[in-house]
């Protein structure tokens, strides 16, 4: 999957269910072909709907959207896990189904005109639209879909995990592809298969402009071809990518695309320095900015264009409101020094969130208290009902405080409270086998000082980490910060070569297979997985399976809350913070839909240029 073009890109795994809208029956089969998939009640839109409600069907086409992104890139290959992919590649490609920001975990046919599967969901068959075409005019075929699936699993450890229960894809008709699953009744699987990004088999097996065969297992800076609404018009390696809307796009009149893809050109510029990136926005060379810094939002947007109304500022409900999130400092438990849960708990006592929130964030953050923060999946209080029953099944494998103690982070915010917290941290460190000798926290058995290096990819993050580092030093820990470029950071985190890093996990309102990639034992040793903490816990594995195979919503919520409690009780991470709003700023040449969708901002798909047609 290609990540969304907003800066806070995240890979959200949407789940599937049996609550589906039926379409026409196949002439050769009694199976029902469905035009959409949803897990939260019935689909909002009936078969044959015209367009999503939030789009402007009369939005003018044209104009240029200039965007910025952090880091760099060295490949345009959309499936390759190695290297740094360019931002925006999703503009070039289509998926079998298209999700909507109006609904939770709902998708409608894009390349596929329908999907069919039996009641036990042992397989799912997708039927391609007859008029789906690649940019070179050739039809999108079932062979392309099979090729895309196989290469996605081969080339991306993350996608291999995501599709781990999809064992096979095969051509099953002139326009049909059947995916076989290794377990029945996993309601998520048809949905996640529908998210599969489809690439052209014939193009990747063809010859490039240099006369050499293309190789999808390698990086490339040749403009890739897709079936989507845009093509790559210009590339400056590592610096910029420009996409241009295709006038001959086959799917421009498909209902899920009506009112979308309005900009003629979308150009991304890559910045290594966040301050330079912000200056580019201030100068008017970048049109849109999602602001991640609370302090900059409060103090940095007083330039003339804002005062004169030429730059608009908006505070909108956070795009994460449809999901649960965990953002945290992540100790790498593959390293022996972080394997004791009491030591990890001690690290939480050294983090003074309240002081950081007051001095750096102007009080705009909330402390994260759940791995599903902000959603109904978050645990609270003590377990009861079905949640308690699930935990009792694993009573001998989970910390006893799961049943007796509500999870709470330490609270500081003033010197006295922080001193108390640091004393508690020292006590926990002693229980973990460490002791203070002078001003050094050492392993009581070896005498070796505990050291911790925080690995980050942006100097702008140092302001957040420095107060934490200073507190760790107060209790004798040799804490340091190492800032590396985006490429080094990616390579080191993929290979788990770090002490502590920062990670944000985002979970859809209907969690599924991604949970195994986040917390599962199998993912702990697979390079490129999202299990950065290195969690290997049979109880966690069992709870992940209960989440994935929950037969109904009530069971899913209970299982997710039980999972949340066990993850929290093991102190796998040091939770950071969460903001209830997202901050966006944009030049008044951009126009957004009057009514934004419930679970997003519709950017950039449904926005348009005020200069279009001029």
Curated annotation (Swiss-Prot):
<comment type="similarity">
    <text>Belongs to the bacterial solute-binding protein 5 family.</text>
</comment>
<dbReference type="GO" id="GO:0042884">
    <property type="term" value="P:microcin transport"/>
</dbReference>
<keyword id="KW-0574">Periplasm</keyword>
<keyword id="KW-0813">Transport</keyword>
<keyword id="KW-0653">Protein transport</keyword>
<dbReference type="GO" id="GO:0015833">
    <property type="term" value="P:peptide transport"/>
</dbReference>
<keyword id="KW-0571">Peptide transport</keyword>
<feature type="signal peptide">
    <location>
        <begin position="1"/>
        <end position="27"/>
    </location>
</feature>
<protein>
    <recommendedName>
        <fullName>Probable peptide-binding protein YejA</fullName>
    </recommendedName>
</protein>
<dbReference type="InterPro" id="IPR039424">
    <property type="entry name" value="SBP_5"/>
</dbReference>
<dbReference type="GO" id="GO:1904680">
    <property type="term" value="F:peptide transmembrane transporter activity"/>
</dbReference>
<dbReference type="GO" id="GO:0015031">
    <property type="term" value="P:protein transport"/>
</dbReference>
<dbReference type="GO" id="GO:0043190">
    <property type="term" value="C:ATP-binding cassette (ABC) transporter complex"/>
</dbReference>
<dbReference type="Pfam" id="PF00496">
    <property type="entry name" value="SBP_bac_5"/>
</dbReference>
<dbReference type="GO" id="GO:0030288">
    <property type="term" value="C:outer membrane-bounded periplasmic space"/>
</dbReference>
<comment type="subunit">
    <text>The complex is composed of one ATP-binding protein (YejF), two transmembrane proteins (YejB and YejE) and a solute-binding protein (YejA).</text>
</comment>
<dbReference type="InterPro" id="IPR000914">
    <property type="entry name" value="SBP_5_dom"/>
</dbReference>
<keyword id="KW-0732">Signal</keyword>
<comment type="function">
    <text>Probably part of the ABC transporter complex YejABEF, which is likely involved in broad-spectrum peptide import.</text>
</comment>
<dbReference type="InterPro" id="IPR030678">
    <property type="entry name" value="Peptide/Ni-bd"/>
</dbReference>
